[in-house]
Amino acid sequence: MLFWLLALLFLCAFLWNYKGQLKIADIADKYVFITGCDTGFGNLAARTFDKKGFRVIAACLTESGSAALKAKTSERLHTVLLDVTDPENVKKTAQWVKSHVGEKGLWGLINNAGVLGVLAPTDWLTVDDYREPIEVNLFGLINVTLNMLPLVKKARGRVINVSSIGGRLAFGGGGYTPSKYAVEGFNDSLRRDMKAFGVHVSCIEPGLFKTELADPIKTTEKKLAIWKHLSPDIKQQYGEGYIEKSLHRLKSNTSSVNLDLSLVVGCMDHALTSLFPKTRYIAGKDAKTFWIPLSHMPAVLQDFLLLKQKVELANPKAV
């Protein structure tokens, strides 16, 4: 009995692996639109998919980012300047993409653009500190999707939303984790709505990677700017050495970040080219071995482990 059970499990694993290796054909006539291509995951994705033969349309925020990307890619790749928080800019870009791709439609939409915003204790913040990451990571992603969706439906293509382990666990105050939690919800509802149209929707959840978004120095500079304007009561509660201690803790945590950005781009590649793309992709050793498993644990265990990473307050009773 045990033998047959093991044989069945082996067969299921083999078939699952085989199914995941089946690829689409005719990449050369398929268009892919990627946001956030100035640096990081988006930049590497644009270069990678251009080399594979896709017709890439790379959305950059800056002229310099666009020029640098063009210099490293083929004539197939086109760049557009796009601020995902500007509705008129998004609308005009979608109109241009529609005229560019014609009847072929858009095989892939990769929503990659994102910002970290301010990462600081919640009682340091104002509602304005939450706006930027929510505007970019959530409303920008939704607006781009809604404008490009008719083209994706025409091609019966793919939508790939880059979320984060911050969409599974809230590891700090600010707008980043609320925005990513919301992206997860939008992704799931979109996936179910698009099922009948033959459109596959996938979500990528990267761990901590060495990108501009995760720069510990920039994160600390933003935190320090807020600290200077805090009330004396808040400063007394946290202590004058809090910023330095949190920077030291942040640097020690980021010393083990993932350096290989291709781990995320590889997930994008599978979601674009597999006949049977996954609904979710987990990228990075830390995400697979710590963050995602922890997200399934009871809240009391999550709190215990995450609070161990926090800097101890000088005088929390001084309220």
UniProtKB/Swiss-Prot annotation:
Enzyme type, top EC level: oxidoreductase
GO molecular function: alcohol dehydrogenase (NAD+) activity; all-trans-retinol dehydrogenase (NAD+) activity; androstan-3-alpha,17-beta-diol dehydrogenase (NAD+) activity; androsterone dehydrogenase [NAD(P)+] activity; testosterone dehydrogenase (NAD+) activity
Protein localization: Microsome membrane; Endoplasmic reticulum membrane
Record: residues binding NAD(+): 34-58, 83, 180
InterPro entries listed in its UniProt record: NAD(P)-bd_dom_sf, SDR_fam
Entry EC number(s): 1.1.1.209, 1.1.1.53, 1.1.1.105
GO biological process, one term: progesterone metabolic process
Catalytic activity: 3beta-hydroxy-5alpha-pregnane-20-one + NAD(+) = 5alpha-pregnane-3,20-dione + NADH + H(+); 17beta-hydroxy-5alpha-androstan-3-one + NAD(+) = 5alpha-androstan-3,17-dione + NADH + H(+); androsterone + NAD(+) = 5alpha-androstan-3,17-dione + NADH + H(+); 5alpha-androstane-3alpha,17beta-diol + NAD(+) = 17beta-hydroxy-5alpha-androstan-3-one + NADH + H(+)
Free-text function comment from the UniProt entry: 3-alpha-hydroxysteroid dehydrogenase that converts 3-alpha-tetrahydroprogesterone (allopregnanolone) to dihydroxyprogesterone and 3-alpha-androstanediol to dihydroxyprogesterone. Also plays a role in the biosynthesis of retinoic acid. Can utilize both NADH and NADPH.
Protein name: Dehydrogenase/reductase SDR family member 9
Annotated organism of origin: Mus musculus
